């Protein structure tokens, strides 16, 4: 079973413009303790936007 404080938790990425939650991914907490920001394609905005980790 997974530990309560998993080292690679699942995170959701939301578009900063339209706030839709488009992507689910995993991250390593030791390497990236801060919120993750990636530039990815948003199908609702029809262009590449900054997606930020949500809680």
Swiss-Prot record:
One of its GO terms (molecular function) is structural constituent of ribosome. The keyword Cytoplasm does not apply. The keyword Ligase does not apply. Keywords: Ribonucleoprotein, Ribosomal protein. It holds the Pfam family Ribosomal_L33. GO terms for biological process: translation. One of its GO terms (cellular component) is cytoplasm. Belongs to the bacterial ribosomal protein bL33 family. NCBIfam families: PRK00504.1, PRK00595.1, rpmG_bact. This is Large ribosomal subunit protein bL33. It comes from Acidothermus cellulolyticus (strain ATCC 43068 / DSM 8971 / 11B). The gene is rpmG.
């Amino acid at each position: 079973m997974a530990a309560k404080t998993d080292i690679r938790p699942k995170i959701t990425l939301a578009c900063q413009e339209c706030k839709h939650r488009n992507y689910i991914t995993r991250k390593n907490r030791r390497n990236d303790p801060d919120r993750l920001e990636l530039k990815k394609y948003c199908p609702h905005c029809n262009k590449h936007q900054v997606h930020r980790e949500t809680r």
